[in-house]
Design a protein with these regions (language model features):
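A Trp-anchored, charged/polar loop motif used as the substrate-binding/catalytic surface
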Residues: 2-5, 48-55, 197-203
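Sec-exported extracytoplasmic/periplasmic mature domains
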Residues: 2-3, 55-62, 92, 96
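Short acidic, glycine-rich surface-loop motifs adjacent to enzyme active sites
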Residues: 22-24, 52-82, 105-106
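A conserved hydrophobic secondary-structure block that centers on an alpha-helix together
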Residues: 31, 38-60, 82
Length: 211
């Protein structure tokens, strides 16, 4: 948008704009491997580091006394998506200021199908998750509506069932499958502190391929 070519008569919409490029620090290995089960070949960043990067851009813009457009070309499949998290609130606050615009990525998943929304009208609802070959691992969250309580019952591709995994008010449950190397960690939160809603976090390590 800042290019200007006098020979061809071309000009972007903001020819006098400059760029502030911030390189984010990678998330700690403990969170990448143990909590979010992220394949090492993919990039991942901590929410706190993203907030620090935005703060740095704010600081530079304030020194230069110039308006800014903050663009975040990153996203996540986790969290409540209600706009109540720390990063959500921080960006919303910045966007309310004069001379500050915040642009983020949204949607464009195509056939990835990383999200599902349903309604438990009776006793249960069946949801299928397709796992590819040689998958390193993944984390998945089930968000509900307060004051309801939710439980999960997981069936592996080989047909093994965990039965209803009792969560109680909170706590972790560890599940192993006899015929597969999959290790499952299920964690219940009666009320998430940022969203005020119940959430079940499921972390799959070395998941078996299939549905």
């Amino acid at each position: 948008c800042w290019n200007e070519d006098n020979e061809t008569g071309f000009s972007g919409i903001a020819p006098n704009a400059g760029l502030i490029v911030v390189k984010l620090r990678k998330a700690k290995e403990l969170f990448r491997k143990k909590y979010y089960c992220i394949d090492p070949k993919y990039e991942a960043y901590a929410e706190t580091d993203i907030m620090l990067a935005v703060h740095y851009i704010d600081h530079i813009a304030e020194q230069l006394q110039r308006p800014i457009v903050i663009f975040l070309g990153i996203g996540t499949n986790l969290a409540s998506h209600l706009g109540t998290g720390p990063l959500d609130q921080y960006l919303s606050g910045r966007a309310m200021l004069r001379g500050v615009a915040v642009v983020t990525s949204a949607g464009n998943e195509g056939q990835a199908r990383h999200h599902y929304s349903g309604q438990v009208s009776q006793n249960d609802e069946k949801v299928e998750v397709k796992v590819g070959e040689s998958e390193y691992g993944f984390a998945m969250e089930l968000w509900g509506l307060a004051p309801n309580r939710y439980y999960v019952d997981i069936e592996s591709p080989s047909g093994q069932k965990t039965g209803r995994i009792q969560g109680g008010l909170s706590g972790q449950r560890y599940v192993t499958f006899l015929l597969e190397k999959t290790r499952l960690i299920v964690e219940y939160f009666t009320v998430d502190t940022s969203a005020g809603a119940p959430v079940i976090v499921m972390r799959f390590q070395n998941p078996a391929p299939g549905i």
